[in-house]
Structures are given as C-alpha cells and as structure tokens.
C-alpha cells in the first residue's frame, strides 16, 4: 500500500494566500467597516429577542407580555393557558442569643367568586389580624408562637394564586390596614381608598408586600384592652363582579419573623363559654351565634377540627352541616337538662358552619381544636 506524503490541496492553499490581501483591504475600507457594524447590530437585535433584559438584577417583565393594540402600559393580557407551580415550602430556622427567626410560607385559604363585594369570605370581625398567635392567618406558625411572649416581623408578603379559567370575570383585591380594629371595607369606594392595595382579575396572580417595622410586639394569647398595641395590622381579600360563587384562587402568606422571650405554652384549644363566671381562652377559631332553638358555630379558617359542645337544653334534635363534612361524631342527651355533642369535621372554606338544633337552648361550653381525621369522635 502506497503512503501519500504530498498535500493534494496545494491549489486551494495558493488561492487562499492570494485572497488574504484582498480581504484585508476590504476590512479596512469604508464598505468593510459598514458591513462589520451591520453584523454587530444584527447580532444585538437577535440577542434582545432571546435574552431577557436585566435591570438592577431583576427581570424586565415587559419582555414577557404579549403586545396588544390599544393596551395601556402596565395592563395584563389574558393568556391562552398559564399556571403557577406551587411547591412545598421548607421552613428555615435561625437561632441567635435569646431569639429564633423563622422563614416560611402558609396557605391562608381558598376564596370564591362573588357578584357583590365580599371581604374575607363574608366573615366579619377582623379575621386576619397580623399576629403570630392568630391561628386563622398563621395555622402552622401559631403552634410555635404559643411558646413565646414577643415577636417582630422582618418581611411579610401576601400572594394570590388563581385556580380559575382565563375566561373568569370579576376582580380580586388583597389589602393591608395598619389598624387591626378597623372594620372591613363595605363597598368598592372604601376598598379603593386603601393605602396598601393590589387588585387584579381572578385569573391573574397578585402580590402585596406588607410594610413592616422594627418593633417588638406581644403575642395575642389573652384578653387585651387595646389590640393595636400587639398587632402589626390586618390584611384581607375581597372579591366582586363575578358571575357566581365558584372557587377562583388561593391566598398564601410569606413571612420571616423573629420570636423573643420563651414562655410556657399558652395552649392551642379554643374555649368559648356563656353564663356566670364564663371565661374564653385560646385562639379564636370560631364565632358562635345562639337563639332559643339554634346555636350556630361559624369556622373562621379551613382545616380539620375536633369540636365538643355541651349546652343546656330542653330537647336536642341534632346537628346540621353547612358547607363542611362530618367525619365522625357522638351525641348524648340528658332529657330536659342538656346535651353533649362531639364531632370531627373538615372545613374547606372560611364561613362553613355547624348548626345545633333543639329547644330551650341556654348556656354552653364549646371546645375547638385543630385535629386529624383519625382523631375520631365516635363512641365505640
């Protein structure tokens, strides 16, 4: 076999050597410089189409929106299909001398559409006071907060995540009020006058950053004359302009909070009583309204609960569930004097109710605590 020792491309090599001087002359000429700059500009324009602009380390959101004729600056166009991936949140703990700092995210609840203005699912009474001891706003954090005397929020943010179609009509608003005792807005004018407010369509995600300060406040674990001294404020979610009462989205709360001054646990069970010497204790998980024939227990937060009711009554007919599920129960009656009802219930949305029915209803003692379905209330 013969081995090739010569370069068969000598003709091409000679042609390349002859072309190099011509290319150099073209590159230094005016036309060559113009061609070079045209190529640079072309590369820059192409890069803008694929690389998002960065300003101050943050993504320029204007590059993510679809241009629509007639749309004003800052408006959002309804997408064909888009969703938020919600992943599990891992709590982060940082210990220092005399304090512990916690960063976490929690689900506050699911909210439904409404035609008229509905705030906090129709539950009144400053439902979402910003205090770690408020089990309605901080169902997970409250179990830790009950072991401390003081707190200070470092960051706090509300996030609305839609779960409805992009054809859903209406509005969703989330707001912050510095005064935890102010009444909820009763109309759209009052809502629009909120200093800290985010409004959006039901299908569009919304976020509201709550202003925080560097003030240590006390936990709300007992009766307080002026709640303004212990609460950072209150937040709320309002819906209006919708076609029905279907679910539109979830509300999440993100926070970093520091706890100070450990104490014996203040308890996790809500106790409500009427009568001479009565005393309420624990977190406010429910509201109670009673007449001579009915006692209605309204839940302020979703979850699974163990409910124990003892009430004076002439007769006891039973318990009616309203927008909640009975998992297990046991009822007993002492004819003509009182009844006892123990229930394990699952509450999907704020405002769900249990209605106790009978005659001659009087004083009661009600115990409510968060539980699992396996905490059965059945008498075997």
From Swiss-Prot:
Localization annotation: Virion
Region Involved in encapsidation, residue ranges: 54-59
Chief location: virion
Record's keyword annotation contains RNA-binding: yes
PROSITE patterns cross-referenced by the UniProt entry: ICOSAH_VIR_COAT_S (PS00555)
Gene3D superfamilies: 2.60.120.20
Pfam families recorded: Viral_coat
SUPFAM superfamilies to which the protein is assigned, alphabetical: Positive stranded ssRNA viruses (SSF88633)
GO cellular component, one term: T=3 icosahedral viral capsid
A GO term, aspect molecular function: RNA binding
Chain segments carrying region S domain, virion shell: 99-259
Region span, P domain, projecting: 260-380
Highest taxon of source: Viruses
Alphabetical keyword list: Capsid protein, RNA-binding, T=3 icosahedral capsid protein, Virion
Region ranges (R domain, interaction with RNA): 1-98
Self-association state and partner proteins as the record states: Homomultimer.
Role, per record: Capsid protein self-assembles to form an icosahedral capsid with a T=3 symmetry, about 32-35 nm in diameter, and consisting of 180 capsid proteins.
Annotated family: Belongs to the icosahedral plant coat protein family.
Name the UniProt record assigns to this protein: Capsid protein
Source organism phylogeny: Viruses, Riboviria, Orthornavirae, Kitrinoviricota, Tolucaviricetes
């Amino acid at each position: 076999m013969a081995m090739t020792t010569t370069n068969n491309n000598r003709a091409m090599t000679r042609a390349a050597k002859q072309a190099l001087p011509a290319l150099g002359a073209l590159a230094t000429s005016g036309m060559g410089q113009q061609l070079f700059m045209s190529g640079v500009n072309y590369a820059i324009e192409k890069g803008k189409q694929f690389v998002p602009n960065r300003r101050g380390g943050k993504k320029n959101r204007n590059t993510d929106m679809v241009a629509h004729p007639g749309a004003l600056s800052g408006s959002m166009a309804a997408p064909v299909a888009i969703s938020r991936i919600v992943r599990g949140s891992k709590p982060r703990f940082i210990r220092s001398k005399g304090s512990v700092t916690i960063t976490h995210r929690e689900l506050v609840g699911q909210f439904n559409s409404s035609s008229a203005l509905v705030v906090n699912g129709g539950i009144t009474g400053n439902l979402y006071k910003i205090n770690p001891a408020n089990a309605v706003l901080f169902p997970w954090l409250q179990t830790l907060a009950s072991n401390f005397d003081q707190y200070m929020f470092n960051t706090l943010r509300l996030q609305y995540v839609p779960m409805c179609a992009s054809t859903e009509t209406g509005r969703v608003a989330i707001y912050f009020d510095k005064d935890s005792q102010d009444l909820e807005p009763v109309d759209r004018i009052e809502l629009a006058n909120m200093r800290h407010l985010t409004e959006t369509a039901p299908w569009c995600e919304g976020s509201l950053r709550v202003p925080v300060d560097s003030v240590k406040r006390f936990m709300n674990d007992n009766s307080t004359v002026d709640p303004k001294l212990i609460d950072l404020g209150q937040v709320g979610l309002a819906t209006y302009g919708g076609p029905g009462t279907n679910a539109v989205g979830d509300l999440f709360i993100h926070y970093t909070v520091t706890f100070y001054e450990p104490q014996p646990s203040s308890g996790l069970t809500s106790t409500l009583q009427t009568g001479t010497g009565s005393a309420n204790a624990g977190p406010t998980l429910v509201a109670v309204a009673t007449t001579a024939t009915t006692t209605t227990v309204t839940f302020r937060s979703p979850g699974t609960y163990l409910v124990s009711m003892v009430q004076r009554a002439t007769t006891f007919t039973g318990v009616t569930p309203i927008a909640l599920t009975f998992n297990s129960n046991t009822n007993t009656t002492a004819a003509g004097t009182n009844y006892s009802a123990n229930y394990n219930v699952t509450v999907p949305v704020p405002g769900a109710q249990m209605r106790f029915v009978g005659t001659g209803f009087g004083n009661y003692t009600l115990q409510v605590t968060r539980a699992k379905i396996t905490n059965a209330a059945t008498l075997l």
